[in-house]
């Protein structure tokens, strides 16, 4: 079982890997304001994604989870590398820079923050009243407290930030089809997951304007089997 929030970038990281490996699993969408109760079996982790094996064993934290799933169901092939230093460096880069860029692109402006929270309220599992409360009360928090601070600290517009990051990512891939070479590896799927998490929102069009980034993105997407 994979416990998720539909709009959580960390959940999308794991979902892409599972779809690529064609692993059958049940997907459980958690109520966004009841995660502590619904994930009580995690002994205090209380964050998505959570992977639970049939024997009840629980895996948490998206990147270690991806490595463990690859190890158990794919003999660790997607984490194997001839250049482990490069692999580790760029997995850390993806988890640091792409993670921090997701909130600014979705909530970096007042209007975009409102559009995002309304969209989230429709995609996530909320109760009748909590859905409406989140849609209209959530965006000032996400925009005013979190996103504006990150945008101000970075100094770039969210679109420019993403295009700069995609330039850096694609430059590292170079002439290869994927970061992993001729086939995607776990670093590819981690980066793909962060970008894919933006796809349900209108702001994704700003990323689609980056030609090289979208060429790579579509290549990874084409490897998904589920």
Residue ranges and their predicted role:
Residues 213-226:
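C-terminal active-site "lid" helix and adjoining low-complexity regulatory extension at the edge
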Residues 1-129:
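GST-like domain detector, emphasizing the conserved glutathione-binding G-site
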Residues 9-13, 200, 212, 216:
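Conserved alpha-helical elements of sugar-nucleotide-dependent glycosyltransferases
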Residues 66, 70, 88-91, 95, ...:
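Non-transmembrane alpha-helical segments in soluble domains
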Residues 48, 75, 175-176, 192, ...:
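Alpha-helix C-caps/helix-loop-beta hinges
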Residues 96-212:
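GST-like fold's C-terminal all-alpha helical module
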């Amino acid at each position: 079982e994979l416990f998720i929030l539909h709009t959580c970038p960390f959940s999308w990281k794991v979902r892409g890997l599972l779809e690529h490996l064609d692993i059958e699993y049940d997907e459980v969408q958690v109520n966004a304001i009841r995660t502590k109760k619904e994930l009580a079996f995690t002994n205090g982790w209380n964050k998505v994604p959570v992977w639970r094996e049939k024997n009840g064993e629980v895996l948490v934290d998206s990147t270690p989870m991806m490595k463990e799933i690859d190890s158990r169901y794919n003999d660790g092939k997607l984490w194997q590398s001839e250049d482990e230093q490069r692999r580790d460096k760029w997995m850390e880069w993806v988890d640091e820079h792409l993670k921090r860029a997701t909130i600014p692109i979705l909530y970096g402006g007042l209007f975009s923050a409102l559009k995002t929270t309304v969209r989230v309220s429709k995609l996530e599992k909320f109760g009748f009243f909590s859905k409406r409360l989140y849609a209209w009360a959530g965006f000032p928090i996400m925009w005013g407290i979190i996103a504006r601070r990150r945008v101000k600290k970075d100094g770039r517009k969210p679109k420019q930030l993403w295009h700069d990051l995609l330039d850096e990512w694609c430059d590292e891939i170079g002439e290869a089809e994927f970061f992993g070479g001729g086939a995607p590896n776990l670093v590819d799927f981690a980066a793909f997951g962060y970008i894919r998490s933006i796809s349900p929102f209108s702001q994704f069009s700003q990323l689609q304007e980056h030609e090289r980034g979208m060429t790579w993105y579509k290549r990874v997407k084409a490897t998904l089997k589920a």
